[in-house]
Amino acid sequence: MITIQGKGVSAGVGVGPLYYYRRATAEIKRYTVEDTDAEWHRFKGAQTGAVEQLGQLAEQARAEAGDEAAMLFETHQMMAEDLDYEEAIEDRITNQKMNAEAAVSDTAEQFAEMFASMDDAYMQARAADVKDVSQRILSILCGVVQGGIASDVPVLLAADDLAPSETIQLDKSKILGFITAGGSGSSHTAILARTMGIPAIVGVGDALKPEYEGRQAIADGSTGALVIDPDDDTRDRLLKKREEQQRLQRLLETLKGQPNVTKDGKTVRIYCNIGSPEDVHAVQVNDGGGIGLFRSEFLYLNSSTFPTEDEQFEAYKQVLSDMDGKEVIIRTLDIGADKQIGYFDLPKEDNPAMGMRALFRASAYGKLGIMFPMVTSVWEVREAKKLCEEVKRDLKHEGIPYSEDVQIGIMIETPAAAINSDRLAKEVDFFSIGTNDLTQYTLACDRQNNDLGRFYDPHHPAVLRLIKLVTENAHKNGIWVGICGELGADLALTETFLAMGLDELSVTPRAVLPLRNAVRMTDTRESAERLMAELDADYTAR
């Protein structure tokens, strides 16, 4: 029996033979072209073909997994036609006289590196999307057709990595689970696996060997363990676990409409993290109490030009209206004006406050909270609040309606903000702890580096102590505090977070009901005494 440990990103237990996905790859030839116009038209033809294919995939995804999954491919369509992406390819073909294949390949690497270098995990995961879109264009240019699964029986599908388009195109009746050497929980493939209810493990690295193909295995998407040639006891234990998970899922459906209250009467708000207006449907279906993190990045990713104030306003208005009075917290994007990022190639804003204007205009249509990211000092908060007041004065002068009850908050995602939270709490209405970045910066550990995965541990006492400190400082100053990172859905820490006194946990929509179940099974009177002992215990990296 061989056990390989990765990261579980989609719960469930899959049992069956291992099968290695064989990807048809396009061979990139490089040569100088003389007729650059003809080469450009060749690229444009492949681009058009890719957009049409992605449209078909979006419809397939909508039929199989719903609107949230379809949105992934609609985003890919926009990426394929992105003006900056297209101009970079055109420059290579027209000015550098590259052939189309080389131009697309080099541009893909450039944009993938751009996304991978960003601080936000969601944005980092978009590097894989750029590569996927580019690979589709390259396949058309090179005449390559992707294969499927050459197996007569359902399998545990193993691969170095899987692009979202590969994931959705595969015959789901033949897939018992996904196992990849690379990848992350923020990747679109992981999101698709969760949406489709397929167990998935990522980050197993080079422990996944081709010679294991055909051998019986069990993939536990909850723990991230892949067991090859399991003994009878292990097999029986994991099969029993699968039956229990299926029973639990049926139970969870009965929790819709029930309160998030512990056995000793403490209430916690369970909100959702979303990335676009289309995700609101998933919040409603899973009975989320509100939106604790709405990433405004989608407006920039899904547009080839800088989004206008009206475009931003309409998007925010749609979400607030659809949530029908439930709280919506929108995180601002911290680029523009004098903080230009060269590789985005964004024009200098004539009105750097237009994003804030859009937010306050939208506030008239629901219960809005505005959240500023990556804050480390009181000065930054005061400057942000000053901008908010200026925007409100302008709107009032122009006779444009807005709400006076907009809460202003900040993300606590750096050690500096956590340590300084006693002072920051005096300036805002709420804190939202971004545990992904807080863990990374506290432990000085790149969470995207698989080799360091053992040391990127959100359960580290230093991280938990900072969360406890932030919670205490928030409550001392009369403001509420929540978590909007992946850790909020970690059921192993639900009891700890409730004992700390966190007021809100914001998670992916599919995590709402499992988290509600965990909350209702918790008695914080029993766990509070144990909390400090656990934080004081000797630590060993997992």
Where are these regions (language model features)?
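Non-catalytic, soluble scaffold/interaction modules
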Residues: M1-D322, V328-I335, A358, A362, ...
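Conserved alpha/beta-domain cores
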Residues: Q249-R542
